[in-house]
Amino acid sequence: MSIKEQTLMTPYLQFDRNQWAALRDSVPMTLSEDEIARLKGINEDLSLEEVAEIYLPLSRLLNFYISSNLRRQAVLEQFLGTNGQRIPYIISIAGSVAVGKSTTARVLQALLSRWPEHRRVELITTDGFLHPNQVLKERGLMKKKGFPESYDMHRLVKFVSDLKSGVPNVTAPVYSHLIYDVIPDGDKTVVQPDILILEGLNVLQSGMDYPHDPHHVFVSDFVDFSIYVDAPEDLLQTWYINRFLKFREGAFTDPDSYFHNYAKLTKEEAIKTAMTLWKEINWLNLKQNILPTRERASLILTKSANHVVEEVRLRK
């Protein structure tokens, strides 16, 4: 069955791995094995083959979209007789905890910045826009981190709105996973990038996801291209537990770590703790607030074992 026949009743074109890999065309590999190793997450296998077959075709597609967007901006400037401000192209990356959003974001940042146009690519995570722990404690939301009510959505929307309005210097708060909190006075300044990659659980959410805090403009209103990284729930749980175990032997051993006490757990205790955290917080957030946004994405990457992408769906 052809791609066209497969997708008559869906807004997406569906590609298996081989079909998608063929769309790389002649795009050269610009990352070395060592660079790829530095880009991968703590619990992920990221091979040269994965970058070549999945991310190079995606970077080629994005380059087409970005070039088209720049031409459209030039037409508007010609019509208005103005010299337009630099308006960044915004790419959002959503998906569950432990699915590998951050790795996808870092790989795309590296690839897009190495196209011949030498575009400047900034990467921001929405973790920085979580309310500080003090606020979450006051509101009884410490066990709801990552849920819609835990974010300062007004600040996040203002951040992307300012960027799209051409504001030259825009600041974003920075989150530390070591202290499990927003870093006080740790803002990062973003200076007119050509491309902004915005990575987070909530970047595809809209008004229906924020009944507790009604407002009329959302992050998704400013996004030019959105990606959802998907995987079966059993794999997500396994990846989350494995990541927790690696943190137990690594980051959690730091005395400054918010979760330092977890480093003292036995492996069996750590697995039990991770499963509880997954079921009571992360799985619940996935089912209620993250997975329902998947079909809003421009492109869906579906992973199988070992974080290997086996299917790509591209909105028509």
UniProtKB/Swiss-Prot annotation:
Catalysed reaction, written as an equation: (R)-pantothenate + ATP = (R)-4'-phosphopantothenate + ADP + H(+)
CC terms in the record's Gene Ontology section: cytoplasm
Pathway as given in its UniProt record: Cofactor biosynthesis; coenzyme A biosynthesis; CoA from (R)-pantothenate: step 1/5
CDD domains, per database record: PanK
EC number: 2.7.1.33
Keywords from the UniProt entry: ATP-binding, Coenzyme A biosynthesis, Cytoplasm, Kinase, Nucleotide-binding, Transferase
Pfam families: PRK
Protein name: Pantothenate kinase
Keyword Nucleotide-binding: yes
Coiled-coil annotated spans: none
Binding of ATP, residues: 95-102
Native organism: Shigella flexneri
Localization, UniProt: Cytoplasm
Domain of life according to the entry: Bacteria
GO biological process, one term: coenzyme A biosynthetic process
Keyword DNA-binding: no
One function term, GO molecular function aspect: ATP binding
Top-rank EC class of the record's enzyme: transferase
Protein family (similarity comment): Belongs to the prokaryotic pantothenate kinase family.
